[in-house]
């Protein structure tokens, strides 16, 4: 059995998230999803939806076998539980594949890291674009 790990914030679920998880799932038979903690997100605005609610939404997706929250202290801690064979990164995730693989190896993991290519194309395949659309609509209503 090949264990796959996908990670992300998953704030305001949209078709881009589903596409990422469906593509990640193709790399193995068991898909684990690590949902980022509110306190650890630094490379973009803090999520609108609280972490426990985001986790609940991800768990409800048919493509996902297991979902868990990340660690606030050590991003590698949940990997001890999951023991992934492959980590699949989305096109826009901030990690460098080789650098992450090296860090994993130094911690005793024999995990391959792959990055998906082109993102799913749709008008609102971005939490940021969804928020922007809501704000624009709200302004026109005022």
Curated annotation (Swiss-Prot):
Recorded GO terms, molecular function?
Answer: ATP binding; FMN adenylyltransferase activity
The record's catalysed reaction(s) read: FMN + ATP + H(+) = FAD + diphosphate
Query: Which EC number(s) does the record attach to this protein?
Result: 2.7.7.2
Q: Which residues form a coiled coil?
A: none
Binding annotation for ATP: 9-10, 14-17, 92
| Classification via InterPro entries | Archaeal_FAD_synthase, Cyt_trans-like, FAD_synth_RibL, Rossmann-like_a/b/a_fold
Q: Which coenzymes or cofactors are required? A: a divalent metal cation
Indicate the family of this protein.
Belongs to the archaeal FAD synthase family.
Q: How does it assemble?
A: Homodimer.
Its function, per the record, reads: Catalyzes the transfer of the AMP portion of ATP to flavin mononucleotide (FMN) to produce flavin adenine dinucleotide (FAD) coenzyme.
The protein here is known as FAD synthase
Its source organism is: Methanohalophilus mahii (strain ATCC 35705 / DSM 5219 / SLP)
